[in-house]
Design a protein with these regions (language model features):
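Conserved NAD+-utilizing ADP-ribose enzyme module
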Residues: 108, 115-259
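Intrinsically disordered, low-complexity regions enriched in proline, serine, glycine
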Residues: 78-80, 99-101, 109-113, 200-201
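Glycine-rich loop/turn
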Residues: 62-88
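Intrinsic disorder/low-complexity signal
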Residues: 1-61, 250-259
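Short charge-dense sequence patches
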Residues: 44-54, 100-111, 151-159
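Beta-strand elements of modular eukaryotic interaction domains
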Residues: 56-59, 77, 87-88, 127-131, ...
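Extended catalytic/binding region for NAD+/ADP-ribose chemistry, centered on the ART fold
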Residues: 82-104, 140
Length: 259
């Protein structure tokens, strides 16, 4: 494994290396140190780590566990995409997320055709995954790579995903987010479980939804995604189904919805 660079970031992965996540313990120690600031009790007294050490070692769990994946740049035309896709690490708390994020290569330093994928645990970032095959994705391409703050935008996309702010409770659509590094652009995508189709209720009392409601849910997610990416009102974010993309032979198919 290569050594860290002078600016403190992990090295840019070469063709045969996926980015390593530093041990979570290192970040936890940093977080615990930062949290040794004074806090006020309801009675006005000051609480420090000396008064209540347990509260300064607490992890803040996320609603779901998430897995970070990395697609390393291909070395030749014969490379199998599945072999390029590497699982990096799974985490379930805010502290673990920051420990990972602060110790891997920034998106802006990745090689061409590299990708980061952040998906709920148990879901592979592939169209063929059982939980993805009926879904689709919102995506936007940033074509001026020199002027876009891709590291900040990717961070905000990840925080919105793990913070569960991209959809309403019960929508159950967001599967994960992805960033692609390409020669002429960066692209950030948000994968969903469905393409907005109707879902019947079941005998267990689970409420179904109409196709119109499904479309409304996806468009609401698209609008929130657009806000997270700090896009202008005139910018257009497109949604396409994975099946349509597969049939077109491209990661981009004709847009099913736009916001």
């Amino acid at each position: 494994m290569a050594t860290a660079t002078e600016n403190g970031h992990a090295p840019v992965p070469d063709e045969n290396t996926a980015p390593d996540a530093a041990p979570a313990e290192q970040k936890e120690q940093t977080e615990q140190t930062e949290q040794k600031e004074e806090k006020t009790q309801t009675n006005g007294d000051i609480v420090t780590v000396f008064h209540d050490p347990d509260n300064f070692n607490v992890k803040h769990p996320l609603m779901h566990e998430w897995t970070l994946w990395f697609t390393k740049p291909p070395s030749g035309k014969g490379d199998n995409w599945n072999e390029l896709l590497k699982e990096v690490v799974t985490f379930g708390s805010v502290e673990e997320f920051w420990g990972i994020y602060n110790n891997i290569t920034p998106t802006s330093e990745l090689g061409l055709k590299a990708d980061y994928h952040l998906f709920k645990k148990g879901i592979r970032p592939e169209w063929e995954d059982q939980q993805n095959k009926h879904g689709g994705k919102w995506s936007y391409s940033f074509k001026d790579k020199r002027s876009v703050a891709i590291d900040d935008l990717w961070l905000h996309a990840q925080l919105a995903a793990i913070g569960e702010t991209l959809e309403n409770d019960g929508d159950n659509e967001v599967m994960g987010v992805v960033v692609n590094v390409r020669k002429g652009f960066y692209r950030i995508g948000l994968w969903t479980r469905t393409v907005g189709k109707s879902i019947p209720g079941d005998k267990n009392g689970t409420e179904g939804r109409s196709a119109a409601k499904g479309k409304e849910i996806l468009e609401n997610i698209g609008r929130r995604f657009k806000e997270v990416l700090r896009l202008k009102e005139t910018d257009v974010v497109e949604f396409s189904g994975h099946t349509d993309s597969a049939h077109s032979g491209s990661t981009r198919a004709k847009a099913k919805y736009t916001v």
